[in-house]
Amino acid sequence: MLDTIKIIRAKLSQVADSQGLPLYDEREVRALADLLLEEVCGITRTNRLLHPERILTAEERARLSSIVARMEQGVPVQQALGYAWFYGMRFEVSPDVLVPRPETAELVDWIVTDLRSRPTSSSDVSSPVSKPLTICDIGTGSGCIAISLARCFEDARVLAIDVSSAALNIARRNACQQNVDNLHFAQIDVLEYVDNLDSNIGNTPQNNSFPQGYQHLDIIVSNPPYICQNEAAEMSEIVLEHEPEVALFVPDDDPLLFYRSIARLGQKHLKKGGFLYFEINAAFGEATCQLLGQMGYRNVELRRDIAGRDRMVKALYS
């Protein structure tokens, strides 16, 4: 029986190391074990260091055993827990949504920094800030981007859209959990919506249209599908088996599919002086910038993440 902190920490490390995550080095595996002990049992790092032989209670053992059993089946630790931390908040996750990742928090940081550094009113077309600020998060998933921005800008109006009703249900619960009420959700297929625009269809179907009050946007942000199908062989089986394929992959012959469609949507719905913010595939940073320039966007900026990879793009609509 795994009764002590020291022994169960070793077991958790063994499980994490064996479940197909070669990206985890020994330090990260230890951190994962420590995370579970803190999240599941409330045992802080200080307590672990001071009392490594402390006997876990029967309830603690049962809860940890359940988590470990799911991890042994290849379930990501966040899904085994049922939640992930993002931007200081706890978000429900499931196989219906992507697990929020640190590089996405960097994208949110960029937007927050930009908006807080600009005046609240300006005649300068380069400033998108108006009152109230109107933001749209396309492909919201768990809602981590939209909810974080809604919390940072409580007087803003934020629209979170996704093609998946299951994802939207999770995002709604997360918004409720965080007491965010300046957020509206809509089920919209962006690719279909843009196809209708480009086909000159007079009326977009009612169930696939932007709601009233969100027709003119200051900010569009998106972390859309951007992994080519031929990259799947290089990915962890844990991601492939437990995160939604629809949120991950694009055709090999059209890797910028969603960026082109969202940029086209921006041409219709962004205010003059509004901005696009994207998370991108590091392999297509320059190509994404070129695409936006060709579509009439200005001041296109490519930014690297903390790991030094091209990961984010910002562009001005004018």
Where are these regions (language model features)?
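A general structural signal for well-ordered alpha-helical segments in protein cores
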Residues: 5, 33-34, 64, 77, ...
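Residue-level signal for pocket-adjacent positions within structured domains
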Residues: 43-44, 51, 76, 81, ...
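Short, solvent-exposed loop/helix junctions and linker helices
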Residues: 2, 57-61, 98-102, 252-256, ...
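S-adenosylmethionine
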Residues: 152-157, 161-317
